[in-house]
């Protein structure tokens, strides 16, 4: 069992954070199909399914980084992702209007994206400082994909899902 992280060097912090986000991405690969199925907006379900494919690629990139550093491919329980996904699960289990649930799913998904963007931004910076240039490039690629996924979620929210959810409270929609 992995105990506390070692803060005696930036390299150890880098490896610990790699293990953490690796586990987080693996958790996400498991959760995204359920989240996609819970979405009622076809565009939202499609965006989540597309991001599942990207997330599978993120796992592969992280495995490449571990291997390039001569490390065993091993995760460390990502409690942050676990908590975010638990909140998403609660949303999926709630009774209510479909459009409001979709708005809540977007919010939960954006929290995940922002968590990942923070993780990949830090990891990229650490990799650059440590001279792990190939790893930095892979991490930058993943960071850009996470940013694009967040932007897509923004577009969906602002492109009608939030308005549909608002109409429920205004008596404009009965599902």
Question: What feature does the model see in each segment?
Answer:
Residues 1-175:
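Amphipathic alpha-helical hairpins
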